[in-house]
Amino acid sequence: CHKCPLGKTRTNLVFGVGDPMAKLMFVGEAPGRDEDIQGEPFVGRAGQLLTKIIEAIGWKRSDVYIANVLKCRPPENRNPLPEEIVLCMPYLIKQIEIIQPKVLCALGTFAAQTLLNTKAPVGTLRGKFHEYKGIPMMVTYHPAYLLRNPNDKAKVWDDMKKVRDFLNELPGKDSKI
């Protein structure tokens, strides 16, 4: 993709990874350095923490789908620019349409604000289900934030238990997400 300048500065396009039939889809902000090198979302320290979070609620990383709002790394890991989000959003929308998750989980400010079209801070959005185009969506803190603010891990644990419980109550659920 060369719709914005990020296509010229990236090493790899970081589209998404996981089960294309996943009932749970995580959406983050943008690839970081490790993700840009490996071409897969959430493989650095934040990704390792996300994997631990997924495993803590009894699932495997391979059972979920993981994507980002942006598919290319912003230079120096700066925040995504509004025009980059606008240009990249159709790809995320298509991913969500293809995966058809039963629950979305927005990780952090940019994912939450983009999907909910709001300026509200994550602290006020997290902990309860919202809706994105009819899909229940939980907002929680980004794993990178948790690496800097480990005292908020309990809040994310509470959010993820709500997601787990919601999925476990779905009719026709099986042992796999």
Residue ranges and their predicted role:
Residues 1-177:
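A polyanion-binding, active-site-adjacent surface
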